[in-house]
Amino acid sequence: MAVERIVISTGKRKRAIARAVIRPGRGRVWINGVPLEIYPIEMARIKMMEPLLIAGEGVRSLVDIRVRVEGGGVMGQADAVRMAIARGLVEFFRCEESDDELCRMMDKISRDLRTAFLEHDRTMLVGDPRRTEPEKYMRYSARRRWQKSYR
């Protein structure tokens, strides 16, 4: 039966990497050992909760999610966590054997979650390829040059 399984999913954004472990549970979510509801940075917390809000309370109450995230900045980590949770939820409810009624129902939930995530924001499931441009020789930053003086 597909319900007892554990799914490990990853999400990346810039330099941040998040690994989510999703297992059957009661709807608890931890980010680096801190419950999501009391995560200190509010904007990051709201961003991380997006996949759970889109999925709905019915789906959230079926799973426990533990996420380890490292690297990058605050919002990069939030986007990585968001991607890991969204990918993990889609994978958790996916089922290949379609002969069982429960399996068909779970597979429908997985397809509905996938389309809902893609309609809301494509980067929940698909990575964002943009990266920071490296600094060039004899420049202040990637594009800015020294100020030219004519006098």
UniProtKB/Swiss-Prot annotation:
Task: Mark the transmembrane ranges.
Answer: none
* Gene3D superfamilies named among the record's database cross-references: 3.30.230.10
NCBIfam families reported for this sequence: PRK00474.1, uS9_arch
GO MF, one example: structural constituent of ribosome
Classification via HAMAP family:
Ribosomal_uS9_A
Q: What is this protein called?
A: Small ribosomal subunit protein uS9
Give the originating organism.
Aeropyrum pernix (strain ATCC 700893 / DSM 11879 / JCM 9820 / NBRC 100138 / K1)
Q: Name one GO biological process term.
A: translation
- An example of a Pfam family matching this protein is Ribosomal_S9
Q: Does the keyword Ribosomal protein apply?
A: yes
The entry's family comment says: Belongs to the universal ribosomal protein uS9 family.
UniProt xrefs under InterPro entries: Ribosomal_Su5_D2-typ_SF, Ribosomal_uS9, Ribosomal_uS9_archaeal, Ribosomal_uS9_CS, Ribsml_uS5_D2-typ_fold_subgr
PROSITE patterns the record matches: RIBOSOMAL_S9
* Entry keyword annotation includes Transcription: no
Q: Which GO terms describe its cellular component?
A: cytosolic small ribosomal subunit
Per UniProt, which keywords does this protein have? Ribonucleoprotein, Ribosomal protein
